[in-house]
């Protein structure tokens, strides 16, 4: 497995971790949980608990290093893709990391390489792929000594949290980048046997082409050229190039105004429109594997108050990212609201009173108790739902999902 390495001047800037290989046994590993269908509304309720668990005793070395919690994504072959969570990383961060991993492994119908990702997920599990979430920030030479892709707490945001909402560049969200590195290395296949060798060949060739014509590897820093050569020596150009495209495609550099482009200016395109015009080849490769919208459930930080929007609003820079979300859930007990976008959203409130506006599309609000526990009243152009979760006002919502059935609204 490729351990990401970089020159000192860029290691922290790019969020690339460096670690020693783990000497643990490569014996077959059993899953600790069952595989749930993320497209089923019931999964939202089922995953309120049980996703993050105590680290199993068989991972004694991880436990010794403070990785006291564990999660996993179960591949179709029944084997786990493991996630180890160190003390100091929140459950919210770990849950989001798991959701992002599952999103990358979700089938994308009609795409050349992503229509059936079961072989990619199975390869990851067979390769005993692991994601580790250490506390704090990366420090060169102090990485936990495990054969696992690192993603540090200081580079993980959660929707609704202050780092996400304020686009805090001191805590630039590297979640998509680092988790896709794991999918790329252990699933698509680079230094380990993978499921999509032709895709990897195309990605590697395009990375070299992008360097050659100035789309990627732009020398905004004196160390970039050395970093690119280091990546070339370790055969990691493809991984870093497509990760840059992914970050800009899903809005993670849309609010960055310190330099043109994305990834601190190393990549030519800042947002999806710029990718289409400045790097159409990169766009084609990304869309050969990943969908245009992010379909994982965004579970908002429990501290969030106000209205979280899935619709782009130039006055709210965080919506460069949230505009590509489809499903969002409020957590905790603070008064907060949700606004959907033009897609078919699945939205869920918390234990407070919430206003949920679905916007365009066919939108569903999720409640985790039986329908008999709620009172539904339609008044003018909204619907009021009162029950164990408080009293919610619903606008432009077409369906309400309950634990025991669904109600179709007519407004």
Residue ranges of model-derived segments:
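Bacterial N-terminal signal peptides that target proteins for export
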Residues: 1-8
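Bacterial N-terminal signal peptides
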Residues: 8-15
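Bacterial Sec-dependent N-terminal signal peptides
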Residues: 15-39
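N-terminal mature-domain "stem" immediately C-terminal to a signal peptide or N-terminal signal-anchor/transmembrane
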Residues: 35-91, 95-96
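Acidic/His-rich structured neighborhood in mature extracellular/periplasmic domains
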Residues: 78-215
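Post-HExxH zinc-binding segment in Zn-dependent metallohydrolases
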Residues: 187-258, 263
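Pan-zinc metallopeptidase signature
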Residues: 245-323, 348, 366-367
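Glycine- and aspartate-rich repeat motifs characteristic of hemolysin/RTX-like Ca2+-binding segments
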Residues: 313-366, 371-375, 381-386, 400, ...
